[in-house]
Amino acid sequence: MAIAREPRLRGQRSDAARNREALVRAATAAVHREGPHVSLATIAADAGVGIGTLYRHFRTREDLLGFLAHRSFEQVLVNVQAAESEGATGGDALRRFIEAAIAQRNELVLPLHGGPPVAAPETLAVRDQVHRAVQRIIERGRTDGTISQDATPRDIVAFGAMLSQPRRPDPEWDATCHRLLATYLNGLCRTDSRVGPTRSRAVAADDHAPLDSHTSPGPLQEGECRTHPG
């Protein structure tokens, strides 16, 4: 009897996996469209399943949003690790990292993309791995001369989030994003004689702030040049 039931069980598992993936895709699009307080019934309807199916996969709204954030940070981690290993220079790795975020912007639900703040320890751990990888890329760029400005991981993450917001209807937006990226990277590689080798206390302190926080960096200090985009 167990052998006879096996094909049916495989089919049920396959259906469950398809439903879950449909829910994840629908939830991602709905959060981008309406924000994190979008109706769960709307998400279920968009996925083509009943609300009961949604609750079988995600018991609460927080579970669903937390899964979307964790999944997004894991993808960003894959991107930054690939950029770090494939980039010929620090600057090239940085370009690859942000270009990947732009290409995947409709798949990411993160705090700087309109998602809720992250609290789950396992998700924070993945986020911290991303930040450390970005720091390594920056240090590599300073060593090879392709990143000469006093950029911080916070700057890079914030700028990447700006360019990788969910798709806009303007057909020229992709080209605009890549022009802005090129301009930003050119600025990072430009030596400014006003900035000495010693980093200011304001910038050093800013490094330790959560990179997905919604707070603004402190005011510029006299003689300080920061590459933060706004």
Feature-to-residue mapping (PLM):
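Basic, helix-initiating cap at the start of DNA-binding domains
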Residues: 1-37, 41-46, 63-66
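C-terminal peripheral helix-coil segments that are non-catalytic and often amphipathic
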Residues: 1-7, 96, 131-132, 136-147, ...
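Amphipathic alpha-helical interaction segments
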Residues: 22, 42, 92-100, 155-159, ...
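Helix-turn-helix/winged-helix DNA-binding modules
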Residues: 35-36, 56, 148
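Short hydrophobic/aromatic patch on the recognition helix
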Residues: 48-58
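Hydrophobic alpha-helical connector segments
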Residues: 67, 74, 78-107, 118-122
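Phosphate/oxyanion-binding loops and surfaces in catalytic or ligand/nucleic-acid-binding neighborhoods
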Residues: 100-108, 163-166, 187-191
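Short linear capping/connector segments at secondary-structure termini
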Residues: 111-121, 201
